[in-house]
Curated annotation (Swiss-Prot):
Subunit structure: Part of the 50S ribosomal subunit. Contacts protein L32.
The organism of origin for this protein: Endomicrobium trichonymphae
Recorded GO MF terms: structural constituent of ribosome
Keyword Ribosomal protein: yes
Name of the protein described by the UniProt record: Large ribosomal subunit protein bL17
Matching Pfam families: Ribosomal_L17 (PF01196)
GO cellular component terms listed in the entry, alphabetical order: cytosolic large ribosomal subunit
An individual GO BP term: translation
NCBIfam families per UniProt: L17
Length: 117
């Protein structure tokens, strides 16, 4: 029986994929808007939504969990100081994907991922 997997493998090793998502999430939380390929954007949205939902608990275990996931101290500080109060009343849908077009060099679909204000 063929088993379906949750999420895309992105054609890279699991450790590389995990590092990629952590770095993209840190950049998204710091700058609130980043440009990447469409497949990476879709994976990033699912990953970052889970992090924000976990951070909304705002207890010590949530802080430690987020700190373990994201290596940037500035991004973690921004999550708890700015983003959690912003999304306090919102139950999901913190990010948005906007398709931009294709990249000239390799014709990859490009998208902008941004945090909803």
């Amino acid at each position: 029986m063929i088993k379906t997997y949750n999420g895309s493998k992105l054609g890279i090793a699991s450790s590389h994929r995990k590092a990629l998502l952590r770095n993209l999430a840190a950049a998204l939380f710091l700058y609130e808007k980043i440009t990447t390929t469409l497949s990476k954007a879709k994976e990033l949205v699912s990953y970052s939504e889970k992090l924000v939902t976990k951070a909304k608990k705002a207890d010590l275990s949530a802080m430690r969990a987020i700190n373990g996931e994201i290596n940037s101290k500035a991004a973690v500080k921004k999550i708890f100081d700015i983003l959690v109060p912003r999304y306090k009343e919102r139950s999901g849908g913190y990010t948005q994907i906007l398709k931009v077009g294709t990249r000239r060099g390799d014709s990859a679909d490009v998208a902008i991922v941004k945090l909803v204000t």
